[in-house]
Amino acid sequence: SVTGETTPGLYAQYTYKLGEKLTVMPGVRWDHSDRYGSFVTPRLHVKYSPAKIITLRALAGKGFRSPHALAENVTLLASGRDVTVSPDLKQEEAWNMGASVSMNIPMFGKILELNEEYYYTDFLNQTIINFDGAKGAHTLSFENLDGKSYSHTFQVDATYPLFSGMTVTAAFRLNDVKCTYDGVLRQKPLTSRYKGLLTLSYKTPLELWQFDVTGQLNGDGELYDRSRYPAYFQLQAQVTREFRKFSLYVGGENLTNYKIDNPILHSHHPWTSAFDATQVWGPVTGAMAYIGIRYKLEKL
């Protein structure tokens, strides 16, 4: 990985606007790394608003990144695995693109805020983290990508005021993140396939009290050995009382009391290669309550 690198660069951008409806921003960046040489990064952003209630956005471009294998993954050292780092890690390189739609839709005398977005990343070079791969069991290897690696992400979220003081927010995200390990294209470990969120927030007419409840659904995914962990649901709640110069709040987290049964593998043998505290895919503590105060400082 990179221990020292100097990268001067030049950047140029052009902005074209057609009234208030269309904005186009192409750009290009040239950099020269004393480790990887010269590289060019093009970008394009487009924003189009055909009507007041809708805004379309699109982007495409290329990205480069210098890997810092151990510095960026210190938590992965919390195991007894044998760690190896390839001496010739390449600069990471990827194409990315995406699009989004934002709408403010009149509905029953109120405004529904609806957003949809999709992003795609295709890696040409990537530093992958290979667990228990060709180097054997209980190993961790930082290697260059040899095959495909990509990420598809789709998200939709909506906010709507049901009635005076009551706001509902819902969101759902799908992830398709795959990478090639030892010649096999598989789901990236410890990456949930989906996530859902529902929040109810209510303020009393004088805004002295606020009540918030949030439910979160976390999707299933793969572990290092290709076994799967299950989806699980969590619930959070908070009550806030506003005063003139401060606010008092009380709440609870993980009210469903969901916990992983065995978060640390082989915890009774911490000095063996089988010890592993890096596969924590969910909460390790049960339901928790808290209380706090926020004080509002006067403007100077």
Locate predicted features:
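Transmembrane beta-strands of outer-membrane beta-barrel pores
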Residues: 6-8, 28-34, 60-66, 73-75, ...
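Outer-membrane beta-barrel strand-turn architecture
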Residues: 16-20, 24, 40, 48-52, ...
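Gram-negative outer-membrane beta-barrel transporters
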Residues: 17-21, 114-122, 144-223, 294-299
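C-terminal beta-signal and adjacent terminal beta-strands/loops
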Residues: 168, 239-300
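Transmembrane beta-strands of outer-membrane beta-barrel proteins
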Residues: 24-26, 56-58, 97, 112-116, ...
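Surface-exposed extracellular loop regions of Gram-negative outer-membrane beta-barrel proteins
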Residues: 2-33, 39-43, 160, 164-173
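Residues on the lipid-exposed face of transmembrane beta-strands in outer-membrane beta-barrel proteins
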Residues: 10-16, 44-48, 99-103, 156-160, ...
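Membrane-embedded beta-barrel scaffold of Gram-negative outer-membrane proteins
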Residues: 49-51, 55-57, 90-144, 150
